[in-house]
Each structure stands twice: as structure tokens, then as C-alpha cells.
Amino acid sequence: MTETLLIATLAVPLAAALLVTAAPSARAADRVNVAAALLTAALALVLAVLAIADAPGASARGSWFVLDPAAGVFLALVAVVGLASALLSPTYLRHAGRGWIGARRSHVFYYAAFDVFWAVLLALPLVDNLALAWILVEGSTATSALLVAYSGKRAALEAGWKYLILTTLGLAIALFGIVVLFVAVGPGGGGLSRLDWSALNAAAPGLPRETTLIAFVLIIVGLATKVGWAPVHNWLPDAHSEAPPPISAMLSAALLPTVLLIAWRTELALGPGLSGGAVRQLFLGFGLLSLAIAIPFLWRPQPWKRLLAYSSLEHMGILALGIGFGTPLAIAGVVVHVAGHGIAKSLGFYTAIPLLRQNPGAARLPARGLARTSASTAIAAAVSLVALAGLPPSPLFVSEAMVLLGGMEAGLLVVAAVAAVLLALGFLGLAHALIEALLGGRRRAGSGVSPRSARAIGALAGVAAVALVAVAVAAYALPGSSLVEALMRGAA
């Protein structure tokens, strides 16, 4: 039953990508995609619950896929963010212009690319093989680059091209690392199955340490371009700024964390054959550098979506620190942070839909004066930025505390102290941005907010606020739980 559920979860969005091409009108394409999204999310969430609960027969490995608690956590995240993006896409598309081609065909193009992109993201947490994971990550690049450039404007085309080139170069580096690792594993039966997570974990202690380290560094540095870690994050602000808001939410709240999961699984699989210090230094270096580079941009006035993009750089850095610290408390913080960031960041990008609907110029200006122009949009912006800044009762406050305490628990007091200072500076930057967005009096980018779409975003903000508080409450039960123990075991 589990295998059938897994196949159905991936098959429905792929089937929807084909069905929308036969839709007779843009409205029909909307309906097909929404129906498929509801079914896809329902299947994925059932699968995720089975995996997280470690139900009998759920934690199993197939020929190419694995269903374990880690897969369940990230699968649930991708399902929820994908569903919300699918439901809000018709609202965006009705006033988005024609994109590259005519109105109906523009809808078809958007939905077909969206559904394939979502299917790839749903598959990534479930994949049980490093080589297949690389193929899926590259597939996510191709489909999402088309969506980044959807509007057809010069800035969007440049952002899509930049995203495609830089991430493909990074993935080429990762591919070289995979080849080095495959050669190090040596000849034998099984072909590419030798790159299964469990097979790598079993073989790692017997591999040449220097070769394994070189392969590991190449793979992680290559994947870092997709995760958005500094200094290989250059595509991130432009792509998030130019993509349609539902796609920006998918990129930041779903794509970045799922690729990070692949990097994490690689670390867990090869860990027995590596020096713990070398692995730790790589993740901690990416984490601190990402925080340090993000902070100045959070302090500067930024267009709304660009501000959220730099916030993603900061939060991916926090996740890198949690993995680098590697203690149970830090790993619990990583889980909470992934969930909280996914909810808050996607809400932030959805807030751009009413901002852009009647005022496309809002994409180029910092959002200001929302409290005077649209109460619903102001509430959504406030919920998003309060959560992202880590202000209690945000679950990100709890997760950041867990990560920092985990660093102290690991004996890395200096790293934890530096991270705490950087997080405090990031908090102040986002707090200033929030005040400007709500109460700022000049260049009010929210002056053209659409009442209908603003009400929808306001309702979504209420749901998101409840979900954020629920995650914060659940976070206190996470340290020492079987879920964290399963995540620590990883590929073992």
C-alpha cells in the first residue's frame, strides 16, 4: 500500500501537467490544476504522516526511494507549500499578463511547468540514491528556471538565465564529486545502487579517506549553489524577485530545504569515512558566511520579495549551523526551523500577490504604509516578518535557541556566540523592515492593493499564524524524541 501511495503521489502532478494542455480555456486550466493539487497534497500528507509516525511498513527502502522520518518531514513541507501555491496561482495569473505567449496558453505553460516542478520536489525527499538525487535536482533547475522567467520581461529573463547558468555550474561540480565517489567505491555488482544512501554508509569506513573527503567537499559545494549558501548564492535575490510570487514561495520554502536534505543525507551517509572536524567546518563555514553576508542587505531598504530572498540566505545559514553542530538539540532545532521558515516565508511571498495585482511597480520599491492601505495585507506582512525575525512566539525563536544551545553543547562556544550576534543583527534589520512596511510614509508600494486578493491573503495569514504557534508548541516536545533519533541515524 505504501509503495502504491508513493507512486500515486508523484503520478498525479505529472498527469495534471499533461491534462492542462488539453484545457479549452484558462479557467478550465485553473480548475484542473486546483483539483490535481488537492489530490496530490492529500496523498503526500498521508504518506508523510505514515513516515513521521514510523508506522509499520512505512520506513522502508525500495529500489530507488526511501520512506523514513526525514522524508516525511520534508515531504509534508513540500506538500503544504505546493498546495498553497497552486490555490493562489489563479489569483496571480488573472492579472499577470500574457507572459511569453497568449493568455490561455500562458496559463497552460505555467501550470505544466508548475506541476512538473512540484513532482520533482515531492520526489527529492524520497530518493534513496545520490545519483538519482542529482538528476532530480538538475530537473528542478530546468523547470523552475522557466517559471522564474515566466513574465517574459527582460529582468525576469536575465534572472532565469542567471539562475540556470550558476546552479548548473554548481551541479556540474557536484557531479564531478559523485563520479569521484563512485570510482572510490570501486568495481562491483549493483551499478548505481552502490550510491544508495545505505550502501554508501556501509562502504564509507573502508573508502580512502582523502578521496572520500575530496568527493564530499565537491558534492556539498556544488549543492550549496542550489541551497543558496554564501558565497554561491548570487542567483537567489534576482530569481526570487522576478519569479511569480507562488513560484518564489516554492523556491524558498520548498526547493532550498529539500536540496539541503540531500546535502544532509550525503553527510550522514559518508560520515563514518570522514573526519568529523572537516565535515563540521564545512557546514559551519557556510552557515556563518551566509549569516554575515545576509545581514547588511536586511538592513538596507529592499523591494519586498528581494528582502525575503536575503532572509532565505540567512535562514539557510542557520540550518547549516544546526547540521554542523550535529547534537540532538541542534538537529531538533533544524526540524523546527524548516517547518517554521516554510510557513512564514511562503506567506511572505504570497503577500506580494495583492501588492502586485494592481501596481506592478511594487516589485521595484520597498513596501511601505501597508497599515494605511490594506489591513489584511499588513497583517500578513506582519505575521511573516515577525516569525522570520524570530520574535516570540515564533517557532523560529525556539529553533534558533535550540541551534545555538546545541552549538554550546557541542563545545563550539565561539561559533555559537558569533552566530548569536549575527542573528541579533538580523533581527534588528527585519524589525526595521517591518516597521517601514507597515508605517512608512514615503513611496508606498501598497497603494494599489486589490481588496479581493488582500482578503484571501489575510485569511491565509490567520491560518499561518495558528500553524506557526502550533509548531512552536510542538517544538518543546521534539528534543529527545524518536523523530530526532531517526534523523540522527539518517542513512545508517
Where does each model-flagged region fall?
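Hydrophobic transmembrane alpha-helices and their helix-loop junctions in integral membrane proteins
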Residues: 84-94, 119-131, 143-401, 405-436
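Hydrophobic alpha-helical transmembrane segments of integral membrane proteins
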Residues: 9-10, 20, 227, 233, ...
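Alpha-helical transmembrane segments and their helix-start/interface "positive-inside/aromatic belt" motifs
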Residues: 27-37, 158-170, 374-378, 454-463
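Cytoplasmic/organellar membrane-interface segments at the starts of transmembrane helices
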Residues: 193-197, 243-245, 374-376, 427-492
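Alpha-helical transmembrane segments
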Residues: 10, 14, 34-44, 79, ...
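Transmembrane helix-loop-helix hairpins at membrane boundaries of multipass inner-membrane proteins
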Residues: 2-112, 481-489
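C-terminal TM-helix exit segments that contain a strictly Trp-centered aromatic cap at the helix terminus
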Residues: 43-51, 175-183, 391, 471-477
